[in-house]
């Protein structure tokens, strides 16, 4: 694995010179191998080690290099054709392969090669980009988008129209992470490497980036880039220092533990926030 990483790191340093026509066989094979390992879930761009999320930057670099070394090509789809550098994950799947993998894909859901989809996952008509990791028991609902290299935990519900930001456009240092047992409400956006910690509930229409204030109304504490575990979050506003205008923020209205989350429905948590 170290040899593979070295090839990727060296190629990335000279990425401006690389084209599909001049890519050497060693670099091409290394990038292809990494994409295949990401696709199978054997590798992932970020993982939790000793309680902390660690981003493997060299894997992200391999994803970026894949765009440098590959030409656009014609790809056949069910209703139309595509023209892109990255093949679709399910292009060569047959019924037996889908049964072995153990997830459902509802048309016209699109998943790029290099994204991992775990067992018991349901993909409604949605989009999952290259390098993403979607863990077991997760629902990606209609028109939801899982961005490049984003990490989605077990038993997560991404509601209709949710946007989980990627790392490629614009280029981000770390992927956006949704930990296990989270609920992300319809049309919400979580981007720029924000981490939503385990068991959190994000209401409909909440937008969280690195500069978004995440205000805990119980403690008065303000978080940036991280939603603490077990938070129930709605959209809100905070007054300016002068008090003559207010700016958007996300508000933690309550905290719940796993036991409460298991007993109480999501709708009840969001309806009783006063």
Swiss-Prot record:
Cellular-component GO terms for this entry: cytoplasm
Similarity comment text for this entry: Belongs to the transferase hexapeptide repeat family.
NCBIfam families (UniProt xref): dapD, PRK11830.1
Subcellular location field: Cytoplasm
GO terms of molecular function: 2,3,4,5-tetrahydropyridine-2,6-dicarboxylate N-succinyltransferase activity; nucleotidyltransferase activity
Signal peptide limits: none
Pathway(s) this gene product operates in, as recorded in its UniProt entry: Amino-acid biosynthesis; L-lysine biosynthesis via DAP pathway; LL-2,6-diaminopimelate from (S)-tetrahydrodipicolinate (succinylase route): step 1/3
EC number assigned by the record: 2.3.1.117
InterPro entries found in the cross-reference section: DapD_Trfase_Hexpep_rpt_fam, Hexapep, Hexapep_transf_CS, THP_succinylTrfase_dom1, THP_succinylTrfase_N_sf, Trimer_LpxA-like_sf
Main location: cytoplasm
Keywords linked to the UniProt accession: Acyltransferase, Amino-acid biosynthesis, Cytoplasm, Diaminopimelate biosynthesis, Lysine biosynthesis, Repeat, Transferase
Protein name from the UniProt record: 2,3,4,5-tetrahydropyridine-2,6-dicarboxylate N-succinyltransferase
Catalytic activity: (S)-2,3,4,5-tetrahydrodipicolinate + succinyl-CoA + H2O = (S)-2-succinylamino-6-oxoheptanedioate + CoA
Assembly: Homotrimer.
Binding site for substrate: 104, 141
GO terms of biological process kind: diaminopimelate biosynthetic process; lysine biosynthetic process via diaminopimelate
Any Pfam family the entry gives: Hexapep_2
Keyword Nuclease: no
KW Chloroplast (keyword) present: no
Organism whose genome encodes this protein: Edwardsiella ictaluri (strain 93-146)
